[in-house]
């Protein structure tokens, strides 16, 4: 599953150096980490469902997910301090490349009527965020073992100086963006 890392080292790095005229090799944009998170909302009230969500995210990521807890109480959301509110996992190195490879080559093509990811998900600092509506597009997830379908947020953190560099890096890796802009 190291296809993506080899592709990055052999063809993407030289292309980025050439396009952005980067003199210092330490300034070549690289993907630092990928964070997958699920805000449980109503699902958090049922511990069994929340554990099922954590298990599903662990299957998808290939690494154990952590149940996140509220840092402080918010009456408007009916949340108390220490109350479980979501699930997250941070992927780095080999797990990150394996997940991105699976996402780009297997999961996203399985989405019905998929036209590409929006280019609006860049944050101005070279990071990209997007959401997926359901977890069933991943091959590890079995429909029968799911208690409730849920979406997830995926954040790709890069060392790019700006959005233009980050977008080019992700395009070269193979992230399917929508046409235009």
Curated annotation (Swiss-Prot):
Record's keyword terms, sorted: Ribonucleoprotein, Ribosomal protein, RNA-binding, rRNA-binding, tRNA-binding
Protein known as: Large ribosomal subunit protein uL5
GO terms, molecular function: rRNA binding; structural constituent of ribosome; tRNA binding
Keyword hit for Zinc: no
PROSITE patterns: RIBOSOMAL_L5
Function (record text): This is one of the proteins that bind and probably mediate the attachment of the 5S RNA into the large ribosomal subunit, where it forms part of the central protuberance. In the 70S ribosome it contacts protein S13 of the 30S subunit (bridge B1b), connecting the 2 subunits; this bridge is implicated in subunit movement. Contacts the P site tRNA; the 5S rRNA and some of its associated proteins might help stabilize positioning of ribosome-bound tRNAs.
Keyword DNA repair (UniProt): no
Classification via Pfam families: Ribosomal_L5 (PF00281), Ribosomal_L5_C (PF00673)
InterPro entries linked: Ribosomal_uL5, Ribosomal_uL5_bac-type, Ribosomal_uL5_C, Ribosomal_uL5_CS, Ribosomal_uL5_dom_sf, Ribosomal_uL5_N
Gene of this entry: rplE
Subunit: Part of the 50S ribosomal subunit; part of the 5S rRNA/L5/L18/L25 subcomplex. Contacts the 5S rRNA and the P site tRNA. Forms a bridge to the 30S subunit in the 70S ribosome.
Recorded family membership: Belongs to the universal ribosomal protein uL5 family.
Source superkingdom: Bacteria
Gene Ontology CC entries for this record: ribonucleoprotein complex; ribosome
GO biological process, any: translation
């Amino acid at each position: 599953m190291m296809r993506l890392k080899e592709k990055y080292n052999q063809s993407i790095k030289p292309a980025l150096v050439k396009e952005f005229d980067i003199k210092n090799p330490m300034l070549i944009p690289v993907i630092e980490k990928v964070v997958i998170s699920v805000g449980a909302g109503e699902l958090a009230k049922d511990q069994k469902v929340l554990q099922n969500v954590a298990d599903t995210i662990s299957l998808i990521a290939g690494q154990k997910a952590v149940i996140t807890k509220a840092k402080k109480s918010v009456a408007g959301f009916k949340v108390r301090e220490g109350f479980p509110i979501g699930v997250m996992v941070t992927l780095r190195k080999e797990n990150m490349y394996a997940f991105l490879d699976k996402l780009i080559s297997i999961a996203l093509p399985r989405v019905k009527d998929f036209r590409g990811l929006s280019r609006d998900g860049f944050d101005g600092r070279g990071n990209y965020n997007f959401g997926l509506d359901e977890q069933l597009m991943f091959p590890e997830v079995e429909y029968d073992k799911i208690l409730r379908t849920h979406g997830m947020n995926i954040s790709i953190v890069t060392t790019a100086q700006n959005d233009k560099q980050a977008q080019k890096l992700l395009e070269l890796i193979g992230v399917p963006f929508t046409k235009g802009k």
